[in-house]
């Protein structure tokens, strides 16, 4: 599903532990790290997509987490030209994302990257909340900055 402007609707997931650290995942067979994220299917709400992606990419169920906050609007990034599939229709030039801040409520041992036949990640670690800003690929950096900034007050507010 790609909108009329060429952006694919997507959810981004910031999963925090009790210490306020966030889950940082390594893309399979790469040295690229990022937050879990994934597309929103037709007739699927952002929250439904969040739980589906959380399970597919991190192995967690709805009962393992609590939603602390969600960004108010869509945050967009454009793909670098080298990543745009110019022969695909409709043309996708980037992603528009709703970001969710989650608190892990179960044991971290439940995090599993290998429950699907095509895993996206092969490793993960806990990092400080702002660490991803200096590490994520450049074209996603501004969206990360905006999402982290908007959601930070909810992480700092003790539930």
UniProtKB/Swiss-Prot annotation:
The EC number(s) this enzyme carries: 3.6.1.-
All copies of domain Nudix hydrolase, residue ranges: 6-149
Family as reported in the entry's similarity comment: Belongs to the Nudix hydrolase family. RppH subfamily.
Keyword Hydrolase: yes
Alphabetic keyword roster: Hydrolase
A GO MF term: mRNA 5'-diphosphatase activity
Record GO biological process: mRNA catabolic process
PROSITE patterns: NUDIX (PS51462), NUDIX_BOX (PS00893)
Cofactor(s), names only, from the UniProt record: a divalent metal cation
Domain of life: Bacteria
Name this polypeptide is given: RNA pyrophosphohydrolase
GO annotations of cellular component type: cytoplasm
Pfam families: NUDIX (PF00293)
Species name: Pseudomonas aeruginosa (strain ATCC 15692 / DSM 22644 / CIP 104116 / JCM 14847 / LMG 12228 / 1C / PRS 101 / PAO1)
SUPFAM superfamilies in alphabetical order: Nudix
NCBIfam families: PRK00714.1-1, PRK00714.1-4, PRK00714.1-5
Role noted for this protein: Accelerates the degradation of transcripts by removing pyrophosphate from the 5'-end of triphosphorylated RNA, leading to a more labile monophosphorylated state that can stimulate subsequent ribonuclease cleavage.
InterPro entries documented for this protein: Nudix_hydrolase (IPR020476), NUDIX_hydrolase-like_dom_sf (IPR015797), NUDIX_hydrolase_CS (IPR020084), NUDIX_hydrolase_dom (IPR000086), RppH (IPR022927)
Motif (Nudix box): 38-59
């Amino acid at each position: 599903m790609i909108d009329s402007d060429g952006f694919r609707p997507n959810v981004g997931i910031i999963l925090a532990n009790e210490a306020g650290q966030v889950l940082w995942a390594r893309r399979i067979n790469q040295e690229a790290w990022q937050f879990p994220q994934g597309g929103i299917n037709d007739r699927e709400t952002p929250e439904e997509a969040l739980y589906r992606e959380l399970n597919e990419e991190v192995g967690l169920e709805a009962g393992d987490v609590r939603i602390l906050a969600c960004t108010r609007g869509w945050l967009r990034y454009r793909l670098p030209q080298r990543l745009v599939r110019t022969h695909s229709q409709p043309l996708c030039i980037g992603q528009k994302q709703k970001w969710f801040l989650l608190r892990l409520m179960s044991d971290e041992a439940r995090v599993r990257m290998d429950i699907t036949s095509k895993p996206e990640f092969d490793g993960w670690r806990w990092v400080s909340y702002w660490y991803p800003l200096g590490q994520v690929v450049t074209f996603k950096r501004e969206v990360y900055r905006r999402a982290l900034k908007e959601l930070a007050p909810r992480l700092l507010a003790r539930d």
